[in-house]
């Protein structure tokens, strides 16, 4: 099987606005990939899959480059003073865990950023991870009822984001807002079979079975999310950043659901989208520096 992995989540590939990335620094540019265990990365109906059963071959890095004439490069170098500053999006990750029966949980994230723009939260059944007979990346709602982000006791959003476990209209709308897609008519969303309101997919509260879940919730933190010229996320440098979650067995519209609190031991994956500055000064060290 041939697989293509677009490097869309790496800072050099997510400059804002889109810019070419200088490849003439005095230090080598390296791409490091860490592979998961085979039992986590793959799903199989038969147990016993080992890393040695998987072979990866024909690996190549394909990228687009522009080579400038020496005179043009000299003009650009003169205009910039030999210093190239680029603003980029970058993802950071934190993890936590909740045990079955939990009704409230607070996770300290340690996110450090001058402009934290978005936070996304997912729950995975811990027993699924590393089990080739289960979907390791299956996401469940875990009976989540509401959540907020606390930065030095300031709450984002000001009102908790509610999860009703039935239609999840607020979760879906906030997810689209965080993706800058709620008002974008060029983005399509599926609300029909296997879509957002399908109980056995997006709304599944217990993803320990063979049917994978797709629940994901996110919060937009930028004041001017529609502009690529204004960086208006929240400042979390030297701040205590915590995720506050509540779980219960009654949805916010009063409809009872089948399971009390968190149904399984779950692993939380929290992703933060932040803005970083990458700087290359060819008149000094000639190596890249990253500022958060």
Model-assigned labels for residue ranges:
Residues 1-292:
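Flexible assembly/topogenesis modules
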């Amino acid at each position: 099987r041939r697989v293509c992995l677009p490097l869309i989540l790496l800072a050099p590939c997510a400059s804002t606005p889109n810019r070419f990335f200088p490849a003439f620094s005095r230090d080598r540019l390296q791409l490091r990939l860490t592979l998961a265990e085979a039992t986590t990365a793959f799903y199989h109906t038969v147990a016993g899959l080992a890393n040695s059963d998987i072979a990866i071959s024909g690996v190549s890095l394909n990228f687009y480059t522009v080579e400038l004439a020496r005179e043009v490069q000299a003009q650009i170098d003169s205009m910039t003073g030999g210093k190239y500053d680029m603003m980029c999006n970058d993802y950071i990750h934190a993890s936590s865990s909740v045990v079955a029966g939990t009704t409230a949980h607070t996770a300290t994230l340690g996110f450090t950023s001058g402009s934290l723009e978005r936070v996304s939260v997912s729950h995975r059944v811990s027993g699924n991870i590393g089990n080739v007979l289960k979907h390791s990346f299956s996401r469940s709602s875990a009976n989540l009822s509401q959540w907020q982000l606390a930065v030095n006791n300031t709450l984002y959003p000001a009102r908790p984001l509610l999860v009703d476990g039935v239609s999840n209209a607020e979760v879906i709308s906030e997810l689209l807002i965080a993706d800058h897609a709620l008002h974008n008519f060029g983005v399509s969303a599926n609300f029909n079979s296997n879509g957002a309101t399908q109980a056995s997919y997006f709304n599944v509260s217990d993803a320990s079975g063979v049917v994978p879940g797709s629940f994901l919730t996110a919060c937009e933190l930028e004041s001017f999310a529609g502009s690529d010229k204004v960086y208006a996320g929240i400042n979390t440098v030297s701040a205590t950043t915590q995720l506050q979650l509540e779980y219960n067995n009654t949805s916010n519209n009063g409809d009872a659901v089948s399971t009390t609190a968190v149904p399984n031991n779950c692993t939380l994956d929290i992703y933060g989208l932040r803005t970083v500055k990458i700087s290359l000064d060819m008149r000094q060290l000639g190596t890249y520096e990253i500022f958060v």
